[in-house]
């Protein structure tokens, strides 16, 4: 059962900045409650040196189950997410409760290694396909299968965010924000 209507974006040291910040921005423009969650602490440093202050840390969330959880890619950020057991527990709880699970770039490996992509279509950054256990690997840049959204990398961070937002809200809201930000239809 979901205990929090928020979207949790998980930040681990070494996260890919565009893949993390773009979904935060777009989903907030869609008037969703987005919480920046630090996996490795309250201050988290990205793969390219950007340092961000988190709203909450993973330890503060206890057994919360959000409406959605987003895993940005980047290295070593993805490996840090994958190595943190409470991340897997949170992702599994969210999926079991019918929440949205989104992962971009290398991060689909985290949900793939948890077995959550079995029988689903999924994509990821080239070279990480072996971790999409049981998934139908496709070369599309953004893939939505049920309540799961996967994406290939930084260049599609906005499309990824709009796909997540469409599942959480609706396509009309996503299209409105997309147009207001001057994205082409």
What are these regions (language model features)?
Residues 1-97, 110-113, 118-119, 131-139, ...:
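Extended, subdomain-level signal for the structured scaffold at the beginning of enzyme domains
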Residues 143-148:
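Beta-strand-turn-beta hairpins that frame and shape the catalytic cleft
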């Amino acid at each position: 059962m979901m205990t929090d209507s928020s979207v949790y974006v998980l930040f681990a040291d070494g996260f890919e900045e565009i893949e993390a910040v773009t979904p935060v921005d777009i989903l907030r423009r869609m008037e969703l409650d987005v919480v920046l969650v630090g996996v490795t602490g309250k201050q988290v440093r990205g793969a390219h040196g950007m340092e961000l202050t988190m709203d909450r840390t993973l330890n503060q969330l206890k057994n919360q189950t959000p409406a959605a959880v987003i895993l940005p890619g980047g290295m070593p950020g993805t490996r840090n997410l994958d190595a943190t057991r409470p991340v897997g527990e949170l992702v599994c709880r969210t999926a079991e409760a019918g929440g949205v699970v989104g992962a971009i770039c290398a991060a689909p490996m985290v949900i793939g290694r948890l077995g959550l992509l079995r029988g689903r279509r999924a994509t990821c950054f080239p070279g990480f396909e072996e971790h999409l256990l049981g998934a139908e690997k496709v070369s599309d840049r953004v893939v939505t299968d049920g309540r799961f959204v996967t994406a290939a990398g930084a260049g599609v961070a906005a499309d990824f965010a709009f796909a997540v937002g469409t599942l959480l809200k609706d396509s009309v809201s996503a299209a409105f924000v997309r147009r207001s930000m001057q994205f082409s239809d």
